[in-house]
């Protein structure tokens, strides 16, 4: 919305600053943080009142969770999504199709997660939304998003898969790219969802990934920088940095309330939405494989569940004491703050490794 003020650049001194993505990204970050700080307590109070017993705690999980987390409200993702939407509407260029497609994925996945949280809270069960139906809905949202991204790209090379460290090599996936892109988006959403099991564990790596992809989006969307770095230029994607800034701000605000002991949980409302958002940005900026590096922590968490389930079905034995992997370390005696902070450190290192692919070609 503020971007439209640039039309008055000739009449109001200084108004031209709203043209700059970097300025608007900073504005979105501050707005997102302030929104969550101001309205967070009100949202938490209303969710606690509406939910009563709060999020059901796994009986087969670490015993300490039954004592420290019982009664904590969930659906905290509503705080993040509200801050994100308000910030984006204020600071982003709303004529940009990439802004709308990423918002669509974020809110679509957020709605799926909200319904899942609603079923869990009202029925006090972990069953929630049917797994297959949930994946089907997510898949349809992701497929539509990929169609819009292909349309916005306006040339066939948008269906090429870039390879990190290779400046002149890409794999032409053709229309199979639709399926591949949808897999990336759905996979990212559910990987973040699996990571969200300890206070503060998911939100900081999400913010790290958002900051990383905000930088990538800015560089990919800038013809000069993309030529210098020899990465593919995708016109218009620089605007996605504003959304990443909004997530950073809203995430900081949420972390204030989610820091241990958490006053509220993100829930599927937040984890699915934020994962889907990062996945859709990765697809839009043509750095799908780099997502597996920057979001390596999420990949590791998801793989631990896949390996655990496959091993138990095939051999009757479990590889980990408990999955996802963060619960395995809890069972080994690591404290919750140890796990969370160490995983944050891993997320930072992976983000740096992913960003290095921009220069090492």
UniProtKB/Swiss-Prot annotation:
Localization terms from the record: Cell inner membrane
One GO cellular component term: plasma membrane
Transmembrane helix in keyword set: yes
Primary localization: membrane
Record EC number: 2.7.8.13
PROSITE patterns given in the database record: MRAY_1, MRAY_2
Protein origin, superkingdom: Bacteria
GO molecular function, one term: metal ion binding
Pathway per the UniProt entry: Cell wall biogenesis; peptidoglycan biosynthesis
Topology of the protein relative to the lipid bilayer: Multi-pass membrane protein
Keyword terms of this UniProt record: Cell cycle, Cell division, Cell inner membrane, Cell membrane, Cell shape, Cell wall biogenesis/degradation, Magnesium, Membrane, Metal-binding, Peptidoglycan synthesis, Transferase, Transmembrane, Transmembrane helix
Any single GO BP term: cell wall organization
Function: Catalyzes the initial step of the lipid cycle reactions in the biosynthesis of the cell wall peptidoglycan: transfers peptidoglycan precursor phospho-MurNAc-pentapeptide from UDP-MurNAc-pentapeptide onto the lipid carrier undecaprenyl phosphate, yielding undecaprenyl-pyrophosphoryl-MurNAc-pentapeptide, known as lipid I.
Name of this chain's protein: Phospho-N-acetylmuramoyl-pentapeptide-transferase
């Amino acid at each position: 919305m503020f971007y439209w003020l640039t039309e008055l650049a000739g009449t109001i001194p200084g108004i031209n600053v709203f043209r700059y993505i970097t300025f608007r990204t900073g504005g979105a970050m501050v707005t997102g943080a302030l929104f969550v700080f101001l309205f967070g307590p009100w949202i938490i109070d209303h969710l606690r009142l509406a939910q009563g017993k709060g999020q059901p705690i796994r009986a087969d999980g670490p015993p300490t969770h039954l004592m420290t987390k019982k009664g904590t409200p969930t659906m905290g993702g509503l705080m993040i999504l509200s801050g994100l939407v308000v910030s984006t509407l204020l600071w982003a260029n709303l004529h940009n199709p990439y802004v709308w497609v990423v918002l669509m994925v974020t809110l679509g996945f957020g709605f799926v997660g909200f319904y899942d949280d609603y079923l869990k809270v009202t029925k006090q069960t972990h069953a929630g939304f049917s797994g297959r139906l949930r994946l089907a809905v997510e898949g349809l949202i992701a497929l539509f998003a990929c169609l819009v991204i292909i349309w916005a790209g306006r040339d066939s090379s948008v269906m090429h898969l870039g390879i990190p460290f290779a400046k002149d090599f890409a794999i032409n996936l053709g229309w199979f790219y639709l399926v591949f892109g949808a897999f990336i988006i759905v996979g990212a959403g559910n990987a973040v969802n699996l990571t969200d099991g300890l206070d503060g564990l998911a939100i900081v790596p999400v913010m790290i990934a958002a900051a990383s992809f905000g930088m990538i989006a800015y560089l990919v969307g800038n013809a000069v920088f993309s030529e210098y770095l020899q990465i593919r230029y995708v016109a218009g994607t620089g605007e996605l940095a504003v959304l990443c800034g909004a997530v950073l701000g809203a995430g900081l605000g949420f972390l204030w309330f989610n820091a241990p002991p958490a006053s509220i949980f993100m829930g599927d409302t937040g984890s699915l939405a934020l994962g889907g958002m990062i996945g859709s940005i990765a697809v839009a900026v043509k750095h799908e494989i780099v997502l597996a590096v920057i979001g390596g922590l999420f990949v590791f968490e998801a793989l631990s569940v896949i390996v655990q389930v496959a091993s138990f079905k095939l051999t009757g034995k479990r590889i980990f004491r408990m999955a996802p992997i963060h619960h395995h370390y809890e069972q080994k005696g690591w404290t919750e703050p140890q796990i969370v902070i160490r995983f944050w450190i891993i997320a930072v290192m992976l983000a740096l490794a992913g960003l290095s692919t921009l220069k090492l070609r």
